[in-house]
């Protein structure tokens, strides 16, 4: 069967496919860092909200038990459980970025800290 001069095979040329792949690569190079940054920001915000909730629970615990400034730190696992909203598994909220929370003496600033603190951006600390 003879092909005419103007007849063309169906499909994409190599150049067209390379252009599409380059565009997809460029979009991925722009989008992926933004997704990573959004995830880190979301984790930091969740951690800060947990710190606020634990800080409020420490204040409630200290008021109810007449603890004065400088009193020993409250235990996250036993002392604060009645004063804090537990997560779905029935435990104290945890840092979503795998940090650990530590309580300090009553009235200190801050009363609760995350082990990640300023080591990550954005930071996991109470403003």
Residue ranges of model-derived segments:
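Conserved catalytic core of two-component sensor histidine kinases
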Residues: 21, 48, 55
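Conserved Rossmann-like nucleotide-binding pocket used by diverse enzymes
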Residues: 8, 19, 31, 43, ...
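Extracellular/periplasmic head regions of type IV pilus-like filament subunits
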Residues: 56-127
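Alpha-helical hydrophobic helix detector
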Residues: 18-34
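Protein kinase-like catalytic domain
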Residues: 31, 39, 59-62
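Catalytic phosphate/metal-binding cores of nucleic-acid and nucleotide-processing enzymes, i.e., regions
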Residues: 13, 17, 52, 56
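Aliphatic-rich helix starts adjacent to a transmembrane/signal segment
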Residues: 36-51
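N-terminal leader/signal peptides at the extreme start of proteins
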Residues: 1-12
